């Protein structure tokens, strides 16, 4: 998938009708289109990065910090929330652009 075809790249460039719940220079966060809980936000780098193993350490730190900020803004930081990265097809990664799920608002189980 090229950057031009990547839906998350299109979202991060503002080419799709998606409202950001949080954004910084290098990342954006928006509500999942198919939420699995009352709060289900995706945090993505603006740069097209496919796998978590390819993320520079400074950007990874920004992404993790953003998950905390999103959880606080969405009101789930105190009650609890899950942070999940699906890395590769076997893990369930459906879009080949790194994204971190922030999920909460109800009791969650595994996986």
Per-region residue spans from a language model:
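HIT superfamily nucleotide-processing domains
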Residues: 1-111
């Amino acid at each position: 998938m090229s950057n031009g075809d990547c839906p998350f790249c299109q979202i991060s460039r503002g080419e799709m009708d998606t409202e950001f719940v949080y954004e910084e220079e290098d990342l954006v966060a928006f509500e999942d289109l198919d939420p699995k809980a009352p709060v289900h936000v995706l945090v993505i780098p603006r740069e097209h990065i496919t796998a978590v193993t390819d993320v520079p350490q400074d950007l990874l730190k920004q992404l993790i910090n953003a998950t905390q900020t999103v959880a606080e803004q969405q009101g789930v930081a105190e009650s609890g929330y899950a942070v999940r990265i699906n890395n590769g097809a076997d893990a369930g990664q459906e879009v080949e652009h790194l994204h971190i799920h922030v999920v909460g608002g109800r009791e969650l189980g595994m996986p």
